[in-house]
Amino acid sequence: MTQETKPRALNRLKSMYELRAEVDRMYEGGVEASEEGKPVAWVMLEGWSNAILNAMGVKTVFPENYSSLCAAQGMAEPFMERSEAEGWPSHLCGYARASVGYSARMVDLDGKIPPEAPGGGMPKPTLLVASGETCDARFKWFQSLGRFFDAPVWTLESPSPGIRERLSSETYERNVQFLIKELKAFVAFLENLLGKKMDWDMLEFTGGGTNEINRLRWEINELRKSRPGPMHTRDFWSVMTAALFRGAADPEVIIEGHQKMYDEVAERVEKGIAGINRPEKYRMAFEGLPPWHTLGFLDQLAERGWNFVIESAYRPMRPRTIDLSMYDDPMERYVRRRYRSLEESLQEEYEPDEVEIIRNEIIRDGISSRLGLKHISDYQVDGVVLHVLLTCRATSAGLNLLQRRILDVLKVPSLVIEGDIIDASAFNAAEALRKAEAFEETMDHYRKVRKELGMPW
């Protein structure tokens, strides 16, 4: 008599594997380009440069993503140790530390890829493209990497006005003009470095592909509002790399892969199939960056019926519909197609009466308690996991405030788990699981509270 094998807790999407394979091809393409003497850029994720670099014939790889790949395969620790030996502190961003250690190893090998590097490794860069937004390490991280290779570093700046200022249409227009000027300067730098002119038609192709990929990602996420949640956060994290860190991959290939994923998720919605192979007991949201080194922790939570149906990091924006026919400048079209005002976002995301409340709160207080919460209510989650990172102040500093706002406004509790994106030693999975078990009583309690208040879930 044969014994039935219990299916694994996560019900992975078949279409995920095809998109995930594109990430491997990205790194393979970088190595091949380097071997052929073609330019390769190491890029910090900032949303603008990849399409421009690809239009200029530059292959792109991302140290941020490569560090997470190393962590997921259990190969980050040697690079982290090397960065500490080079004098870098242990509280620095894990992405930065791993890439610094990797770069130091390359110097040991006269610029060759370390033989222990997973995924084929990153080749020696022709240039590095940094960003001045969000990350604490910012451009200093990439300036430091440039010293290992004597490679030029370009820092792309992006305007970051306060919330109150962003309500102004004048601020929005100034931001647009700032970005146009900044990106044109970047193009001029590339033309001088590479000795060739920008192919503006190619930028229309690569930039347009980025927009179509974002549209499909957004539509897939809309399907994830269904009960039971048809797509788990692990699948989202696995495929977001192919969209955001796609390097010089053909946009049409990535679009086709996301269309297949949309179709598969839509079929699951129609048939009531969940992203976990257990009854969906709790619908969960994940706030913060992932613990790339211990993603199996989410499998353990899935065994308990925790279905992570939405996440904050790397979430796509609502697609933008805009008439660009009045703009002759291809760079202006590139910017305006993607950069939206706060007022526009509010009008798209909220009901008119709520827009007025949010606008008044921002004018009065400089912030609104309702901002950043909509996905919690839209996906009707029972609890939120807050991943607090010692090494990433940018994503962690506001989580305590977020925890309070989620509870006050939506009556949804949060579980704080301390860890790291790359450093596995900073994450205690057993302790986190014990806290999760106890947290279930809290989620059960607030379900009753929401019901008594007449809330939708």
PLM region spans:
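Peripheral docking tails and interdomain loops at the edges
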Residues: 400-457
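A charged, amphipathic alpha-helical module
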Residues: 2-39, 180-320, 361
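A short, acidic, amphipathic alpha-helical segment used as a generic capping/interface helix at domain edges
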Residues: 112-116, 353-379, 397-401
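Extended, charge-rich low-complexity interaction segments
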Residues: 94-105, 182-204, 336-365, 442-457
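Redox- and metal-dependent alpha/beta enzyme cores, enriched for Fe-S-associated oxidoreductases
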Residues: 35, 46, 54-84, 288-364, ...
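Cap/lid and interdomain-hinge subdomains that line or gate substrate/regulatory clefts
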Residues: 143-232, 441-457
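An N-terminal, globular interaction/scaffold subdomain
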Residues: 40-121, 134, 141-142
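Proline-aspartate-enriched helix->loop->beta-strand connector
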Residues: 125, 376, 380-386
